[in-house]
């Protein structure tokens, strides 16, 4: 091993240690954080109310789902049953299916249960989008075409591109920022891994944001970057004058009558910046209520929570921008043909999924420890929801 290689590796280890990635990878798994990462993180509590809404169980449970065969476009699952797929290679912990406001399928594996919290990772981005829509409705954020520096004026001195970057660019992953999402431990990916590690485990996220560079002009292309949702979360806090957890509690968790409190990771007690990009942990049943809100076009039991227009812009089927709008997906993101009854979904690493199909009045939630085929779970849910039994 030559001297240059030793110096590079030493610098890498020191940098990783400085942002606690070694602690993170030991605690959360050797290839990134796991669904119980909140147990090792500083976090804020998202309080719920005192009158919870509970989904009733349907008289007729959909037991036929376990034996239904489906065909996946990927190489891992050519022809298999749902039960085989979920218990085989994906390490699923729980699946919940709700139709017409009633639970028709609920199953848990291992020590997971209905009242156990799990980190939903990038599903948090979709919840951050919901909060942004509420802030727009309330006039705290004037318009999604406002530039970022209207809310983070300290960035004006950093790079002229900041004054071209809009909230819409953040919502649609068109920021132009030089940031890559990766959990690869290969040395050639060190620079990108280090940036992602700082986002997950660093103690001063605003310092990381101030140090960002641009690789292209905002709005030029779609490129998935967790940092964009983190910046959006900071904007929401600045615009509302509220901590993320408090605003989410008041505007979503309490009005939606969540059964349990949730939590969101923060960078540190000193700086108290929420992990808006992927730090929310909650129960499956409460996550399903976000789906119910979107299914009902922003209305919860007769009360308007967010505008129908915001829901429309987030979820209407479109093939541009890789099927991604306002932090929600449709299956055109993987090149799948549009089904007769298309849904939309929020997606987190390791296959955390909140899927909604408005045509079938369906909500599906999956929590798991891995998903070896990208978008396999959403694809499975799309196939399932288009089955004639629904």
Features from the language model and the residues they span:
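Active-site SXXK
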Residues: 101, 119-144, 170, 232-236, ...
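Active-site Gly/Thr loop motif
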Residues: 259-260, 265, 312-363
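N-terminal leader/targeting segments and the immediately adjacent pre-domain N-terminus
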Residues: 18-112, 141, 176, 210, ...
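Structured C-terminal helix/loop/strand segments within mature extracytoplasmic catalytic/sensor domains
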Residues: 20-36, 346-390
